[in-house]
Regions:
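Glycine-rich adenosine-cofactor-binding loop
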Residues: 127, 131-159, 172-177
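Structural alpha-helical scaffold elements that stabilize or flank donor/cofactor-binding regions
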Residues: 201-205, 224, 258
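Short acidic low-complexity segments
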Residues: 191-206
């Protein structure tokens, strides 16, 4: 019998390593059987309410279905923020029989960090797949842009895949926020975290750069990058924000030079780069600096169809450019399996 899972019943069920493994399988399966995954679809009301739909599945986990979330989106001072976010709703069906398994209300939370924001867990687990294939295996240092919940989740994913990292430099616009972040998470994660006063200090001396903000503006100059570094960015954006008059131009966090200098660019889905005209990659494509076909997909790396990092001097760039139903359902299915084993949830008679 299917069950209903509420937010409090999703707490403490899934760890970051398990989530990264599941999301990796989601992208691998989506590459080998493309019709089981699809880009997100979004609609906007004139008042700024956005509804995002994420259809997809992970056949290896026995799940297919969709996720939906609604939020009141605002743009101010170069940042996107959410005046209100409703709990997401995921519908899980058996990918072999079509039978309903569960209706899941709320965010799946990570064991270590607890409640997430902006789908931070799935986003970080997706970055984690990129870290697995693109970050130098002997990486020792990282630069982190952002000091909120998304940044904490991204850092945990990085440390999960590269436990060799012992030093992190964090930059955000608010000095007090970055100081508090460094104090809290250096203790929690057991690494040195140093708040820095300028973006360049989080870029030049490190092996890995992770952008975990909600900005609409470029965070650093791509000319600051040096050989061997990896960059992850998480701002996707969608053309409807411009078409609806919410933004004058596409959202960006990374500049043209970053894309131009990268030896390997990876996106979650190439289709979303063009269909949503996502600024960080679409603008340099339009300007003739890079080509869409040179961008690898995350699932191609996971399936072994394209290589990840192959040399110590490569600059690699993962554009975690949008969520997918397959990734959402991978993490949600893990939570469902654990919850069911623990006797959580309310049976639904249908």
């Amino acid at each position: 019998m299917p069950i209903l899972l509420r937010p409090r019943e999703l707490e403490g069920l899934v760890d970051m390593k398990s989530a990264i493994d599941a999301v990796c399988e989601a992208y691998r399966g989506g590459t080998e059987y493309p019709v089981i995954n699809a880009p997100r679809r979004r609609v906007h009301s004139p008042a700024g309410v956005r509804v995002s739909n994420f259809p997809g599945g992970v056949h290896a986990l026995g799940v297919i279905g969709s996720g939906t979330r609604a939020e009141l989106v605002r743009q101010a001072e170069g940042n996107q923020h959410y005046e209100f976010r409703e709990h997401p709703v995921h519908v899980l069906n058996d990918s072999r029989t079509a039978r309903l398994l569960a209706i899941v209300l709320g965010e799946v939370t990570e064991k270590t960090l607890g409640p997430s924001s902006l789908m931070a867990f799935r986003t970080a687990a997706t970055s984690g797949v990129g870290f697995r294939y693109l970050v130098p295996e002997n990486a020792r240092s990282a630069g982190l842009f952002g000091s909120g919940g998304q940044a904490a989740y991204q850092l945990l994913a990085l440390l999960t895949e590269r436990p060799s990292i012992s030093n992190v430099r964090v930059y955000s616009r608010d000095p007090e926020n970055r100081r508090r972040f460094a104090e809290k998470y250096s203790k929690m994660f057991g690494v040195e975290i140093e708040p820095v006063d300028a973006p360049r200090a989080a870029v030049e001396p490190v092996d890995v750069i992770v952008c975990a903000t909600n900005t609409n503006k470029v965070l650093f100059d791509g000319n600051w990058l040096h050989e061997g570094q990896h960059v992850t960015g998480i701002i996707g954006g969608n053309i409807q924000l411009v078409q609806g008059g919410f933004l004058k131009e596409s959202r960006r966090e990374l500049d043209d030079r970053t894309a131009e200098r990268a030896d390997l660019i990876v996106a979650n889905l190439r289709e979303s780069v063009s269909s949503e005209k996502q600024g960080d990659l679409w603008i340099p494509i339009e300007r003739g600096l890079i080509k869409l076909e040179q961008i690898a997909e995350l699932g191609e790396l996971a399936a072994g169809k394209r290589a990840g990092r192959t040399g110590a001097r490569q600059i690699t760039y993962h554009k975690n450019n949008n969520g997918t139903g397959a990734a959402d359902l991978a993490v949600t299915m893990l939570a469902y399996q654990k919850a069911r084993a623990l006797g959580r949830g309310t049976e639904i008679a249908i």
